[in-house]
Amino acid sequence: MKKSAGPFIASWRPFVGLPVSLERGRTFSRVLGICTYTPAIRRQMLLSGVSVIPPPLSKNFFRHAHLTGFSPFRSSCRRLFAQNGSDVAPLVSRIPNQSVAPGDTQWSVSPMGVHCEHWLKTRCLPGLPAAVFGSHQQVEAALLQRGLSPAKDASERVRSATREDLVRRERPTSEAGSHPPLPSRSSVSAFQLRSRCDPAVSGPSDSAPCGLSQTSFSLRSSSSSGATTRFSVPAVCPVFLCRSLPRLSGRFSRTRFGKQRKRTEEQEDSKDFDTGPLSSGSIFTVLVGSLLFFDVLRSGLYEHRKLLGAFLMTNAAVFTGWRLAATAGNGTWWTFLMRHFVLCRENLARARIYTFVTSSLSHKSTGHLIFNLFVINQLFRLLSFDLSDRDFASLFGLAALCGGLGHLLVSRQPVLGASAFAYALLWTEATRHSREMFRILPIPFFPLTALQLVQVAMCLEAAMAFLARPAFLARFPASRLLRFAQGISWSGHLGGLAAGCLYSWYKRRVEGDRSWQSFSELCRTYGTSDW
């Protein structure tokens, strides 16, 4: 099977429900399974006599999640036609010219799609009366009114599509009285079509239940004499198809993917050691915070670098605010923190430009706070004799700006944390003291230079950018590595490295300080020997 070039990978056997006809159901299921959206393939794909014309590629995940071809958001949706010798009866949705309203959606489906849509109507909304879907008596009356004689096979097709026959064939094991409740008017109002009911079929006194407007289908059937018969059937199938589409696209639909991701996040939150006032995460936070506080009080470094001590204490204070708001369930305090200590497009739209800086002082999780403060503290100790308070503030502001812009360019999710500043300090250390040796805690016997750490960080962020694609998480929703990559702002980290690069370039080229070396020259000099 070919993989999709779009934002998801198609499933071989998507969930489409119980078929009305076994043979047609298999064909329809196979078509749904093999049809993938690719920008280069705009030709017909034949499988079991079914031709498929895929639409152009779109970057919208919601459109490409539906493999059925019933997307109401495109007028050029796929057309599925069943060809079986002389028995050619495609069901093409049309709206009469006298009742077409601006913006109405045109529908094109196949007989197999019709069976599937009848299955949806009968399974999801069994409480609707059969008159809504149109009976064969109404169709024959409409044909006689137009001076046409209904063909036998066409009448049989319409008669077989009535609700009673569908219930008997589609739900052989269902018990009486087990129908789900009928949805309210407000739940389907967003999917109503603006076209009026065909007056030739349904008179002015006929009205759709729940306030639903109706559209008309035009069915062409070739009889034995070769004449083409055309008749209209009032239906509300597109309205219910809009609501039932997610279940047709299997586990890659937006609805099921969102539910599964939400369930996974709830399970992870229940296992998080940070939850609860007396949890291990909270106790660990208090201990580490106390040690950090006493270190600030007795350290001579912070007496000369009070700005660094203020930075660490501000991060600890904001983190304490997040913890208190989560523990006490104070919605007002939580809203205040979300508005003023989180960087997102909504806050920028409300002219909260200062969130570029305040979000770099904010941490919600214990691990994120401890790791960032540990790295920043260690790197600043090494750079304490090279960077002044002015350099510290300038580099912090530049890292906050570049990291925030880098994240907003590729993601709409809110972001917070001082990781960009940590990466900017790491780049500064690599250009100032490239031969400084570091030992990583999990592997202490494998020392790395500061230059190697920057190279490893760049490779890791590139790997995170590759793994953070929605296609991988849709294919492997239970993977913890992919969920971790989704929660990491790799673009913000790269923005922090870019901030360090810009600041070192300014120091070297503008101020003429030759102690700031070029990263590219260092890589050419020590790249081969280090590895």
Swiss-Prot record:
Enzymatic class: hydrolase
A GO cellular component annotation in the UniProt record: membrane
Principal subcellular localization: membrane
MF (Gene Ontology): serine-type endopeptidase activity
Residues covered by region (Disordered): 150-190
TM region(s), chain numbering: 277-297, 307-327, 367-387, 407-427, 440-460, 484-504
Keyword Protease: yes
The keyword Ribonucleoprotein is annotated on this UniProt entry: no
Catalytic activity: Cleaves type-1 transmembrane domains using a catalytic dyad composed of serine and histidine that are contributed by different transmembrane domains
Active-site positions on this chain: S419, H493
Locations listed in the record: Membrane
Membrane topology (UniProt): Multi-pass membrane protein
Enzyme Commission identifier(s): 3.4.21.105
Extent of Basic and acidic residues compositional bias: 153-173
Pfam families to which the protein is assigned, alphabetical: Rhomboid
UniProt keyword list: Hydrolase, Membrane, Protease, Serine protease, Transmembrane, Transmembrane helix
GO terms classed as biological process: proteolysis
Stated role: Putative serine protease involved in intramembrane proteolysis and the subsequent release of polypeptides from their membrane anchors.
Family according to the record: Belongs to the peptidase S54 family.
Protein name: Rhomboid-like protease 6
Organism: Toxoplasma gondii
